[in-house]
Amino acid sequence: KSTNRGIAPSDFFPSYISTYVDRDVREELGVRKIAEFNVFLELAALRVGEVLNTESLANDCGISVDTAKSWLSILGSSFIAFRLRPYFKNYGKRITKASKLYFYDTGLAAHLLGIESTEQLILSNHRGNVFENLVVTEIIKRYEALEKRPRLYHWRDSNRKEIDLIIEKAGSHTI
């Protein structure tokens, strides 16, 4: 299947990743471990829509926790991925507790997960996470188009019950 520009996603995303890694990550941001960064990018996509355990991600990639934090920062500053903080009434906990990870481009996340078609998505164990990523990013894009910046959070209790997105607006909440 092709996009409206006639470029198949299976052709577009590898080229996009190569350009991003070569130009932005290596040349502009100074990352030298390109092969490791590519593995990191794929393993980060495996965690889309999940509470992010940076230590686990680092261990799976064979890199230090500090390197993983640095590379997550690079994904954020280059608008590849972002973290959604947890909601707590205690503001300090919002900053210190674990965030969820999302990719701005759900198609890129799906590609990194090896999902190249609707049929593969339907059969994928990651379909729920990919769908959650899509919903969260589309809501964010909608607010940005309206030039609004509400505070967005996720919530999970000790029994692992969760709310994927909380939108805080002037003291009220939309779930």
Predicted regions and their residues:
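Accessory nucleic acid-recognition modules appended to NTPase machines
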Residues: N4-H173
